[in-house]
Amino acid sequence: MVRRPTVLIFGAGVSEDYGFPLARELLISITDSFENGTKVGFTMTQCGFDREFIRRFGDELYFSNQPSVDAFLEQHSNEADFVRLGKAAIAASLLQEELTPSLLNRTEMRLYEHLWYHVTGPIGTYAGNQLAVITFNYDRSFEHFLRKSFVASHPKFRNQADEFERALSQIEIIHVYGSLGSLDKKSGNYLVYGGRDDPFNPKVILSASERIKLYHEAIGRDNTTARMRERITEAETICFLGFAFYPSNVRLLQFCGLGENKETKHFGSAYGMKLGEHDFIRQELGFDIRLAGEQTKSLDALREFPVLQPVREDIKP
């Protein structure tokens, strides 16, 4: 169990290990599909968007040289049709990726499995978990993984839905920019993982797209930032995983209290980043942070730093 207040902050690099595209990859995938009229591009016409408008959107997205579709949409936030199409394309792309079998690839230990090892226990002990995950990703791969793991590990949960949801809720997952939908069947925002059985149904895609938020929509519109602030300011340890440290995302975290608690220890992966970029990250954050090397991915960074250390009573002789 994770019994000390601990926050993991997920970026796109976490989901990449489970088959989801990085920000730039998603942008290129959407522009290619819009140009060639393949699956996602064709689906946008079924969602009611004009072919010529789709083509123009794709051209502007490609030549914008923005780091992500989200960043592009933020620049076009006053153009409602651009925002609607962009969000729909993101939703259609990620619902398709949710259906890929990469989540079930068990040939090697990966991040989700490692986290499950640290949070699992007897049914009555889950209330002791103090782990929270703040994710900048729209996909629900981590929630889906946890649900599968909970039920497979505890058959009792199959017939006790309320107890299952209570246990699951002890590991709080906060989607900064929204998600494709809730995996809780009792939720009004419920959407089955991958949108099965019809992930390219226009109603499914448009419904999922309405739950996606841009930067300017994430500030103070609901209780998300309040929940983030509570977890961030109370955390003894915060670890960034697969996170690119884009200035806008850092500012949002600072708005939610990042750096206010001077006792919090900060760690992070920095896969593919050079030492000079480490200095830039520290300047952006405004405090010191221990960063793993440029060849170290999320799982190994988490294992390298003292983030999930058990308290003494959890250590077996």
Residue ranges and their predicted role:
Residues 2-9, 18-20, 38-178, 225-234, ...:
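Active-site periphery "cap/insert" segments of enzyme catalytic domains
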Residues 34-38, 160-164, 201-206, 266-268:
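Short, surface-exposed, polar/charged, turn-prone segments marking secondary-structure boundaries
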Residues 137, 177-180, 270, 293-295:
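Residues at the C-termini of beta-strands that transition into short coil/loop
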Residues 11, 101-117, 193-211:
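Short N-terminal signal/transit or membrane-insertion segments
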Residues 166-196:
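Active-site cradle of extracellular carbohydrate-active enzymes
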Residues 1-18, 23-33, 124, 129-131, ...:
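SIR2/sirtuin-family catalytic core signature
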Residues 51, 186-235:
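Acidic, metal/cofactor-coordinating or nucleic-acid-engaging core segments within structured domains
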Residues 162-168, 203-207, 258-260, 282-286:
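Short, conserved catalytic or adaptor-binding loops enriched in Gly and charged residues
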